[in-house]
Amino acid sequence: MGVYSIKEISLMVDMPENTLRTYLGHYSFAKYYKGRKIEVSKEFYNTLLKYLWNKRSYKYIKNVERLIKNG
């Protein structure tokens, strides 16, 4: 899919940048970092979706599911 900044990803997922930055600080996202940007793929979205379910952040789950579905 590509390499994006946290700001670009927050716009895609429709999540505040600070919230996304906090979530991406979790160790399970370390393998996606490419310098200051993040490599976004279907695997990244699936990891984010799992993390959101664990955090019970239901208002963002629909947005991530939509991105996975649309590819």
State each model region's role:
Residues 53-71:
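Helix-turn-helix/homeodomain-like alpha-helical modules used for DNA recognition
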Residues 16, 20, 45-48, 63:
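Terminal low-complexity, poorly structured segments
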Residues 1-19:
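Polyanion-binding surface elements
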Residues 26:
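Alpha-helical DNA-recognition elements
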Residues 30-57:
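Short helix-start
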Residues 23:
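Residues in the recognition helix of alpha-helical DNA-binding motifs
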Residues 8-11, 30-31, 38, 66:
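Hydrophobic transmembrane signal anchors and adjacent membrane-proximal interface regions, especially
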